[in-house]
Structure formats: structure tokens, C-alpha cells
């Protein structure tokens, strides 16, 4: 199967969070891609929280309102997005997943629809990650 090549329009910048486990994991450990929305009033506040060491929360990727993507934690490390979690036989999903936060004010803060640009950017990133890590 040929590898998916991200579209040129997929802009990824680096802004690393200090919040991750320093133990490297191998590609085959990654079984899931988990999506979240930020649930915060502003994009800046969401990014600041993900970069704040005291918040103890992070993600691998953050999708901005304008559809730009920020890589916050390399996939080879566990970000802190799933907390104490379980799904089927898997526990502590951070160790087996890639976490993607999509900027959205959420249901507590006047929920807004995701833009078509955000959806397109998310789909491109998802296709790339599914191929790269053989996630089904």
C-alpha cells in the first residue's frame, strides 16, 4: 500500500509542550487516534494551557480555527490527553494513542460548528497518521 502524502496545504508548526512522558514508544504501540475539542473560550487560552507545565495536560496535535496544525508532542512520546482511561482491554490510553485537540469553545461556552477548513485539515492529518501508524 503506498504511503499517504499529506496535501501541501497541510501546514504544521512546532510548539512543544513540556507535558509528556519521557519514555519513547515504538510505532506498533500506537493503536488509536483520539479526538477532543478544547472546550475553552479562546484559542489562545487553550494553547497556553497545553503549553503550561502546571496544567499537566497536552496533545500531540492542535488544530487551530484557521486549520493550521501545531505539533505539541512527538508521536514517539505519550502526551497527556486521555487521563485515566479504559476502552475494551486497553487501559491508560495515553500509552497507545495519538491525541488531537480541535479548537472549539465547546458546549459550556456557546458551542460553535467546526469550520470546513478545520474538518479538511483534520481529515488530512488523520489520513496521514492512520497510514503512518497502521491505525484502522
Predicted regions and their residues:
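Active-site-adjacent loop/helix surface patches within enzyme catalytic domains
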Residues: 2-134
Amino acid at each position: 500500500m503506498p504511503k499517504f502524502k499529506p496535501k501541501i496545504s497541510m501546514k504544521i508548526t512546532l510548539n512543544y509542550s513540556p507535558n509528556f512522558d519521557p519514555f519513547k514508544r515504538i510505532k506498533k504501540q500506537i493503536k488509536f487516534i483520539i479526538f477532543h475539542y478544547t472546550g475553552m473560550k479562546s484559542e489562545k487560552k487553550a494553547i497556553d494551557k497545553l503549553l503550561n507545565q502546571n496544567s499537566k495536560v497536552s496533545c500531540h496535535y492542535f488544530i487551530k480555527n484557521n486549520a493550521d496544525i501545531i505539533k505539541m508532542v512527538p508521536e514517539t512520546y505519550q502526551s497527556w490527553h486521555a487521563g485515566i482511561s479504559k476502552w475494551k482491554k486497553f487501559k491508560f490510553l495515553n500509552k497507545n494513542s495519538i491525541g488531537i485537540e480541535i479548537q472549539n469553545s465547546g458546549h459550556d461556552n456557546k458551542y460553535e460548528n467546526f469550520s470546513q477548513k478545520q474538518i479538511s485539515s483534520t481529515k488530512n492529518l488523520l489520513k496521514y497518521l492512520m497510514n503512518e501508524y497502521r491505525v484502522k
